[in-house]
Regions:
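Periplasmic c-type cytochrome electron-transfer domains
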Residues: 1-167
C-alpha cells in the first residue's frame, strides 16, 4: 500500500473559509443542517447511518433517525483521503467525475461556476442544491433568501478568501 498524496491547503484563509461553511447551517433552506451535521468525527466523517436525514432533522448520528427530517436516498460518504488526485469520481452513480479530457462532469454542466478546480470541490457543492439534503421544500424565492443570508452573515475574512479563488 502506498500513502495517499493528500495535500494540505496552501492558503490558510481558504481553509478558514471551508471550515466556516462546513460548520454553519445558514446555507440550508431551513437552517437545520450543515456539512458537519452528517460528517461526524466519531463516525469517520460519516453520520453512522445507512441513509441520512437531511433538512428538518434534529440531533446527530443515529439520533437523527428519530426525528421527522427528510430521508436522503443515498449514504454519506466519508471525507477521509478524498483530497487525493486518484479520486476522480464521486457518488455511487458517478454524478461528479473528472473525465480523461480534464473536464469535470456534473449535473451543473456548463453552468459550473469558475473556481472549482477538482472533482471533490464540485462534489462538495452538490448537497447544497439537493432538495432533501440542504434546500428543503422552499419556494422559488429560496435562492434570493440564500443570497440575503450570505450577505447578512458573511465574515470579511471569508469574503477575502473566497475572492482569492476567483481568477
Amino acid at each position: 500500500l502506498q500513502p495517499l498524496n493528500c495535500k494540505k491547503p496552501k492558503d490558510s484563509s481558504l481553509g478558514k473559509l471551508g471550515d466556516f461553511f462546513f460548520k454553519n447551517n445558514f446555507l440550508s433552506g431551513d437552517e437545520s443542517v450543515s456539512c458537519k451535521t452528517c460528517h461526524l468525527k466519531e463516525h469517520s466523517l460519516t453520520d453512522g447511518n445507512s441513509l441520512p436525514i437531511g433538512v428538518g432533522g434534529e440531533g446527530l448520528g443515529q439520533d437523527r433517525m428519530k426525528s421527522k427530517g427528510v430521508l436522503v436516498k443515498r449514504n454519506v460518504i466519508t471525507l477521509f483521503g478524498r483530497g487525493d488526485n486518484s479520486y476522480i469520481n464521486f457518488f455511487w452513480e458517478g454524478r461528479v467525475e473528472l473525465g480523461d479530457d480534464g473536464f469535470i462532469y456534473s449535473p451543473f454542466g456548463e453552468y459550473l461556476p469558475e473556481g472549482f478546480n477538482n472533482a471533490l470541490a464540485v462534489a462538495s457543492a452538490m448537497p447544497l442544491v439537493e432538495r432533501d439534503e440542504f434546500v428543503g421544500g422552499g419556494t422559488m424565492d429560496s435562492g434570493n433568501i440564500l443570497s440575503e443570508k450570505l450577505d447578512d452573515k458573511y465574515y470579511e475574512e471569508s469574503l477575502e478568501a473566497f475572492n482569492q479563488m476567483i481568477p
